[in-house]
Regions:
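Structural signal for hydrophobic packing residues in well-ordered secondary-structure cores
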Residues: 19, 23, 38-41, 45, ...
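Conserved C-terminal structural/oligomerization subdomain of aldehyde/semialdehyde dehydrogenase
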Residues: 2, 25-26, 225, 325-468
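Short gly/ser/thr-rich secondary-structure transition/capping motifs
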Residues: 91-99, 170-173, 238-239, 311-313, ...
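N-terminal Rossmann-like NAD(P)+-binding subdomain of aldehyde/semialdehyde dehydrogenases
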Residues: 1-103
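Residue-level signal for inorganic ion chemistry
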Residues: 30, 75, 137, 168, ...
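ALDH superfamily catalytic-core signature
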Residues: 2, 163, 196-335, 356-360, ...
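Rossmann-like NAD(P) dinucleotide-binding subdomain of oxidoreductase/dehydrogenase enzymes
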Residues: 94-234
């Protein structure tokens, strides 16, 4: 379907009218919708897996793990927690507000939310965000990616079969349709994608002063640091697994590895072994190995690989017909080269060497670049690891592990700086789609004349006693 500007405007009007009925304020209504959303995902897993294979070449197992099971876990958390989270907070008003003794903080929905989702996890990053919006009591327009055509079509059909359009609807189309949505006066915008488009979203949102959440990849990518005392086999195995996932098209994926020079060659050999063990000698013929999303994405990866052809120590092959490009290790790479100064979003893995004794200099270089969405460190030195993870600027990460911080219940998923703003998952998602409203309960039969005109020295003295 091709949308006009009027079509989008009318959808927003209908959703606002639905919101103003007050139906979504009922927490039991929200829980019912979340349960319907969960059933939608579970009852249509085969259709979802097929769409993800068509778009991204994902295996059934990877599709279920990344875009179905993880979404269901997220929805379960909202179903279980939303009643508790939505309860008003009780606060004492304090002596300065006497005779009032009671103040409540209500958690109120914004209204009409706009969710703009990317191609790489078309269900996780649309339905997962939708669950947060529903839990918060909003209506939702989902602008799904035009790149993941099969997934967007399935998502559009499933949402249409599950919810009325005045409550939740999926809109497909390109950047022009996204701009139609952004021009509308919605009440909350949640965007997942690149920093450049994130800036455009913020600029458009500023015209209506619409609050925005941005989940971005970060302009200089996510680092993995491998110290000389790390378990190299374990680190290589986990890094290879993660780079294979979705052919590297993951916002929290490892963009580049910095490995201690003392163990760099050994680490490279372990990395090669891990890749071969997991996806074989020829991943281009392995049906479990995903593909890139489009010809343009393939061409960009192929072009960048060719620029570093003389330093490719593993991989470096692709298939233009299937858009598959093998996991490719580029080594050694200087920390100032272009490939480690932008987000690759693909299966290329540049490896930088550093002297382990000069780890602080490395971390200083990383700290001066744009903040990544994730950071991963591999070391036996837990004290150092904790210090780094508690002082660097990044979204989230792991010590001696990859990506699993995303699966932990009750903790936020977020970026900082050029990797985003705002947080979601569980209670953090509920908070992101609600705003607090503080209400003081006054008295009608007893007032304090102290605050009223005319003022005198006695009143000022008493005010001083109250307000200190």
């Amino acid at each position: 379907m091709s949308y006009t500007k009027d079509d989008i405007h009318n959808l927003v009007l209908k959703q606002r009218e639905f919101f103003l009925t007050g139906i979504t304020l009922d927490v039991n209504f929200r829980i019912q919708q979340l349960k319907r959303l969960k059933e939608m995902m579970l009852n249509n897993s085969a259709r979802i897996e097929k769409a993800l294979y068509d778009d991204l070449g994902r295996s059934d197992a990877e599709a279920y793990f990344c875009d179905i099971g993880s979404v269901v876990m997220e929805i379960n958390e909202y179903i279980k927690g939303v009643k508790k989270w939505n309860k008003p907070e009780n606060h004492g008003s304090g002596l300065a507000c006497f005779p009032s003794t009671k103040t409540k903080v209500y958690k109120l929905p914004y209204g009409v939310s706009l969710i703009i989702s990317p191609f790489n996890f078309p269900f996780l990053l649309s339905v997962g965000v939708l669950a947060a919006s529903i839990a918060g009591g909003n209506t939702a327009l989902i602008k799904a990616s035009s790149k993941s055509k099969a997934s967007t079509e399935v998502l559009k059909q499933l949402i249409a079969d599950t919810f009325p359009p005045e409550y939740c609807v999926v809109i497909d189309g390109g950047h022009d349709i996204a701009d139609f949505c952004l021009e509308e006066r919605v009440d909350k915008i949640f965007y997942t994608g690149s920093p450049n488009v994130g800036k455009h979203v913020m600029e458009m949102a500023s015209k209506n002063l619409t609050p925005v959440t941005l989940e971005l990849g970060g302009e200089t990518g996510n680092w993995a640091i491998v110290r000389k005392d790390a378990n190299l086999k374990d680190a290589a195995r986990k890094i290879a697994f993660f780079k294979i996932m979705n052919a590297g098209q993951v916002c929290i994926n490892i963009n580049q590895v910095a490995v201690a020079s003392e163990v760099a060659d050994q680490f490279i050999e372990e990395l090669k072994t891990a890749y071969i063990k997991q996806i074989g000698e020829n991943p281009l013929e392995n049906d479990e190995y995903p593909k890139l999303i489009a010809q343009r994405a393939y061409d960009n990866i192929e072009k960048e690989a060719e620029e570093y052809r003389d330093r490719i120590v593993f991989g470096g092959k692709g298939n233009k017909e299937t858009w598959k490009y093998a996991p490719t290790v580029i080594y050694p790479v200087n920390i100032d080269e272009p490939i480690v100064n932008h987000e690759i979003f693909g299966p290329l893995l540049p490896v930088v060497r550093f002297e382990d004794a000069e780890i602080n200099q490395l971390m200083d270089v990383i700290a001066r670049r744009e903040h990544g969405l994730a950071l991963y460190v591999f070391t036996k030195d837990k004290k150092w690891a904790k210090k780094v993870m508690s002082t660097q600027q990044y979204g989230g990460g792991c010590i001696n592990e990859v990506c699993l911080h995303l699966m932990v219940k009750g903790v936020p998923f977020n970026g900082t700086g050029h990797s985003g703003m705002g947080a979601y998952h569980g209670i953090w998602g509920f908070r992101e789609f609600t705003h607090p409203s503080s209400v003081l309960f006054g008295h009608t039969h007893f007032n304090l004349p102290l605050r009223e005109h005319p003022y005198n020295k006695k009143k000022k003295k008493l005010l001083g006693a109250f307000l200190k």
